[in-house]
Amino acid sequence: MKERKSSKMPNNLPQLQNLIKRDSDSLIHTCFALSQFLQQLRHYQSNLQIFKLNPSHTSKVLQELVMFLCQVAHCYPGHLGSLPQELKDLLHKHHSVMDSDLRMTLCRALILLRNKDLISPTSILELFFELFRCNDKVLRQVLYTHIVTDIKNMNAKHKNNKVNSTLQNFMYTMLKDSNAVAAKKSLDVLIELYKRNVWKDAKTVNVITTACFSPVPKILVAALKFFLGSDEGSAGDDSDSESDVSYLKFEFLEMIMNSLASLLLPKHKKKHKQTSVNFSALHLINDPQGFSERLFKQLEASTGRFEVRIMLMNLISRLIGVHQLFVFNFYPFLQRYLQPHQREVTKLLMFFSQASHDLVPPEVVEPGVRTIVNNFVTERNSHEVMAVGLNAVREVCQRCPLVMTDTLLQDLAQYKTSKDKSVMMASQSLIQLFRSVNPNLLHKKDRGQPTESREDSKPLDYAAVEAKDYIPGAELINYANSTIILLYATLIPDGWETDEGCDDGSDEDGWIDVQHSSDEEQEDEDPSGENQEGEEDGQTRAARISQMRILTDEDFKKIRMKQLTKEVQPKLGKKRKRATTTEEPQGSRNELVALENIEGIYKKRKHDKASRLETVIAGRQDRPKYGTKKKAKMNEHAGTSNKEKRRKKNFMMMRHNKLVRGKTKRSFRDKQIALRDSLLKRKKSKI
């Protein structure tokens, strides 16, 4: 009975908390709970004054009272209106000298008040960013998780632009904070919110660009990894090497729940199908030219680790290739690293290829190509080095074809007869590239069979643009097979002649009757249309169709397929018919260069024991048993001949035979004569 009475005493805070939260209509019950609450509130205020006298002293009673008041704060908003501000002031003034347990309790209390929507998000989040300066790894991880989750929940239904703008401006100042840990965690928050599509805008990206010029290597590497696309797992990598195992478990469970929901709920599946376009962060930078120039200036003065300089080179080359920038000093800077013995030389070749584009002057890139050829494509190097050099030259010429000269190209094309397959294939790929880009640079025997697309395309000069007033390939579509041609009568030029025999009613309506698309098959079979199409010029017909017809997606698909046919099939006569392909054409070239395109050389790998056994077993199939290749006997029961017996007889038994003892060897004179005769015979054969 004493235990039951003691459970209702005011010192039992969980019981009092349950009593206050419980919904009861009893007036006596409500008055008792209020009196007990006011008593605990006065107790909290007295303990708070004691704590302010000695902030470094730990107080378990104060921790319990703070959590109790935060749990029931929504029940008595009038009495606890100043509680959030008091807790924020305590953390703001004494967080550096405060006990770690008490500091964690106060932070959890503020998180609880924020979840109850009793405190504004801006003030508490700014305080939490300042608390990143604390030397407490567990606290930083809790604050990081809450900040990301809270901002994500605020923007779940609609974008809260006012709060987002305030927080982004505050994070911009936090990235310049003198405390490296606080700046690193602030950067991790920005990157995580961008990855979760919460703050995926240009302002966030341009705030992250400021971290690329940080003197702290960890902040610099995190920002570079973000722009290079390898920022997974960098959110928890601070000065104390924090691990985010709980977060990974949460992500794994969320992935499982989403997969189950997509199977059970059709609405959930439709929701996930509506995804926005994922633009790269490099396209959202406001001033890519100035950003790349500042990065290159930092790279020239950098004395840090080689891995960090490699990442800077990669980012600069991507910016130049994506935005087609002009950073002319970057090419001679890379040129000094283009040596076969250089560390990470394949990546450096990839950076040089990425930085090449059509708008850069050829005389700027040509020295680098010459350096690659002189240092890599030589007989003194191994076959792998030569193949890598040829692949790098091909990637550069694919983006800037004008850097190649006919003399250099014809010299590189001679490696197509190399005995090494990797060098031979790399040379053939270079020849194949210039067959489509500029076949005039190749030797006549290397140009291959001319195709229709090669006749239409011509090499352009530097900075020349081929502007067309028609859709290339539109002449391949039958003009009569119109699906959507609705021309209003007022849009018809006055110079056009109309048919006198047409119905007057059609002119009054203002629309032109168009043949239905269901008649396409019948018109395709009409050979007269094909003869008329052949007599008309291709460009004139393409311009007329582009102006008079609204092309659909199926029409563009047919154009791409027929253009691919023109690239593959040779140029034939007009009356020669050819079969159309059904394959889809490849897309346009990527803005970035894949490392596999340079390292992709043919190399015969060594077989392990399992693969060798498979080869041996496969070779034994449909093959007679192993054994001697002697001729089969005419009679299986017959014995051996005397000649075979003498050959197989033991030498010790034959050593006393007169044939063995009487055997004479050639004298020295006989050997001289034989040597002279052989030399004379060899000399005559050469003549």
Swiss-Prot record:
Basic residues biased stretches: 644-666
Signal sequence extent: none
SUPFAM superfamilies linked: ARM repeat
This protein's UniProt keywords: Nucleus, Protein transport, Ribosome biogenesis, Transport
A cellular-component GO term for this protein: nucleolus
Keyword Lyase in record: no
Keyword RNA-binding applies: no
Main location: nucleus
Basic and acidic residues bias: start-end ranges: 667-680
Listed Acidic residues bias regions: 520-537
Protein localization: Nucleus, Nucleolus
Domain of life: Eukaryota
Annotated region (Disordered), positions in chain: 517-549, 561-587, 615-687
GO biological process, one term: ribosomal large subunit biogenesis
Function as written in the Swiss-Prot or TrEMBL entry: Required for 60S pre-ribosomal subunits export to the cytoplasm.
Family label: Belongs to the SDA1 family.
Protein name: Protein SDA1 homolog
Species of provenance: Nematostella vectensis
Lineage, opening ranks: Eukaryota, Metazoa, Cnidaria, Anthozoa, Hexacorallia
Gene: sdad1
